[in-house]
Regions:
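Non-transmembrane, aqueous-exposed alpha-helical and coiled segments at domain scale
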Residues: 1-423
């Protein structure tokens, strides 16, 4: 038996999909514990690219049970489309489990998300407008609708009608928007009831029994640590806890049941949307990373902001998550650069900071302090052992490992499943 958490150590888009897929091949269960379809990852299988946003990666393996945990928020209409896409690719989705306690993203959540974001103007967060934030807000305000509510048609209607009363007041009085028609929403969700009935379960009990029976379980995180609602670059964050502690809470298991916590980072760093980014490269280096790394959002299609790897924020992620090890992806993207840089400090008012600052304002005013490394030109996509990497690539990896003080045990050198180095 083993229980492993895989999560992003940056602002998301670290290549978690490939890493999760690596673990999922031997897992009995793969559990998503937070987020919704605001996150996306692409898994390359031969000539096919499969983009998933809500369904756990374990769905690709017939012996694995994919679980959407209690900490997730579920857009059932989107889930229906994603399951249909998988079925068209002859991928069986019958084993999917959805926690009865997961919350439902309603149509009014998506509308409110869009209106709120537009109202912020230049101060916008950069939300995906998928309704995730408003759905989590309803959850905290104790008026959310959960998956189990759809099983009782009468109770579901009562809750929806009550919520629509409040929503329509907000729409008409604050945003000058036409009110929503409650019957349209009820009609739409009547077509989703079979999906819920076929997949709903007590996910916490299911996972607890799996642990008791010595099964292998993978907890799959979405987004990244620096987007955590409590520990990220607030307010430019997501609406859930993306750090490792939520793997237990969002799945319904105790933290002592977690054996291994794997952080995933790119060999550089990227960010989608607004917010501070000290090592961002708005120059030819940034363009190189974006184009060679195909840095465009799976969900939004937006061009990602790219820059040099920030070891201060990475060491912070190690601490916040109690990472046991680090996986590095996209090392191959750096091939061809004459010079590489690692951020090893923040300079603020003539003071060099080497710990991630608790005062977020520092991130808006500080300057990065870099250590410079020679690059390499070799194609490393076929390399299978660390010793066969170019010497400069080895030096780069060793410098990262020495700074963050946890072992690097996996390096991805290409997008294919097999293009990896296991250390």
């Amino acid at each position: 038996m083993s229980t492993t958490v895989v999560l992003g150590a940056q602002w998301g888009d670290e290549g978690k999909g490939k890493v999760t897929d690596f673990f999922a091949s031997t897992a009995d269960y793969v559990v998503r514990f937070q987020g919704g379809n605001n996150a996306g990852h692409t898994i390359v299988v031969g000539e096919n690219k499969i983009a998933l946003s809500l369904t756990p990666s374990g769905v690709l393996y017939p012996n694995c049970t994919p679980v959407i945990g209690s900490g997730c928020v579920v857009d059932i209409g989107f889930l229906k489309q994603e399951l249909e896409m998988l079925n068209e690719k002859n991928i069986n989705t019958d084993k999917l489990v959805i926690s009865a306690n997961a919350h439902v993203v309603m149509p009014y959540h998506k509308l409110l998300d869009e209106l709120i974001e537009e109202s912020l103007g230049e101060n916008k967060i950069g939300t995906t407008k998928k309704g995730i934030g408003p759905c989590y807000a309803d959850k905290i305000q104790r008026k959310g609708i959960r998956i189990q509510d759809l099983l009782d048609e009468t109770n579901f209607e009562i809750k929806v009608r009550k919520n629509i009363e409040d929503v329509n007041l907000t729409l008409t009085k604050i945003y000058d928007h036409s009110p929503l028609v409650v019957d349209d929403i009820l009609d739409e969700f009547s077509t989703y009831r079979d999906i819920v009935t076929n997949h709903v379960a007590d996910a916490s009990l299911l996972i607890a029994n799996a642990i008791k029976n010595k099964k292998t379980i993978l907890f799959e995180g979405a987004q990244g640590t620096l987007l955590d609602i409590d520990h990220g670059t607030y307010p430019f964050v997501t609406s859930s806890n993306t750090s490792s502690g939520n793997a237990a809470i969002g799945s319904g298991v105790g933290p002592k049941n977690i054996d291994r916590i794997v952080g995933v980072t790119k060999a550089y760093i990227s960010r989608v949307g607004s917010g501070p980014f000290l090592t961002e490269q708005n120059n030819k280096i940034g363009d190189f990373l974006i184009e060679k790394g195909a840095e465009f959002g799976v969900v939004t299609g937006r061009r990602r902001r790219c820059g040099w790897l920030d070891l201060i924020s990475l060491k912070y992620s190690v601490r916040v998550n109690s990472l046991t090890e680090l996986f590095i992806t996209k090392l191959d993207v750096l091939s061809g650069l004459e010079e590489l840089k690692l951020c090893v400090g923040y300079k603020d008012n003539d003071e060099v900071i080497t710990d991630y600052p608790f005062n977020q304002n520092v991130l808006n005013s500080a300057e990065p302090v870099y250590e410079t490394f020679d690059g390499w030109t070799d194609d490393i996509s076929t390399v299978k052992s660390f010793k066969d990497l170019p010497n400069n690539a080895q030096s780069y990896i060793k410098a990262i490992e020495a700074f963050i003080e946890v072992p690097i045990t996996f390096i991805s050198v290409g997008p294919e499943r097999t293009e990896n180095i296991i250390i």
